[in-house]
Amino acid sequence: MKKNQSIEGNSTLVLASESSARQSILTGLKLVFDVIAPDFSETAQPGVPPAEIALINAKGKAGSVAAKLAGQSEANVIVIGSDQVCCTDSGMVLHKPGSRDRAIDQLTQASDQWLTFYSSLVLIRNGMVERAHVESCAVKLRRLTNLEIKTYVTADNPLWSAGSFHAEGAGLRLIEKIETTDINALYGLPALVLLQALRELNDPLAYAAWS
């Protein structure tokens, strides 16, 4: 957890996620933030568009943390919720695999295919939703051999990543092409939209020490 040291009058930022990738993005932006795990079970309702699933989950995560914080502090709190859903061109959602065999199956299906990642962002301040956004990223995987897939899954263990690979790490070795306006959205958090939203909220931001 990052200890929030924002100047009096600034907002306290709270990330409603234990995702190391999202924490790394915020840390790289020199934002000071706290981390609180959400009490929310991600939904995957049949028939619901993937972009909507991502938004529902982000709202649920941020909302659960905002409810925890309600009445606990006089600070101006902004809760950041985010989720990511991956689907194939045919519309099949590739959920977090949860097992090695399922990850191998997903990557086998996705080999030489275009995938779309929907990364959502929800900001809740003092109980009110201030921003709700979904960013899409297109990724083309190389034609992968069975050996490449099994070796990658064993080495990188992407069992809790949508699409069964870590694009911010060794998963890049599986990729042929990326189309996105914000690479951070592919990594799990639409950072450009987040920063724009914070500016629009007239928040001066609390920067971590530059040293």
How would you describe each model-predicted region?
Residues 2-13, 47-211:
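Anionic-ligand binding patches
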Residues 34-42:
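A short beta-strand-loop structural module common to alpha/beta enzyme folds
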Residues 24-28, 45-46, 72:
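Short loop/helix-cap segments at secondary-structure boundaries that form the rim of catalytic
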Residues 21, 41-43, 129:
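Surface-exposed, flexible loop/turn segments at secondary-structure boundaries
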Residues 18, 38, 126:
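Cofactor-binding loop segments of dinucleotide-utilizing enzymes, especially the Rossmann-like FAD-
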Residues 2-31:
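N-terminal beta1-alpha1 ligand-phosphate binding loop
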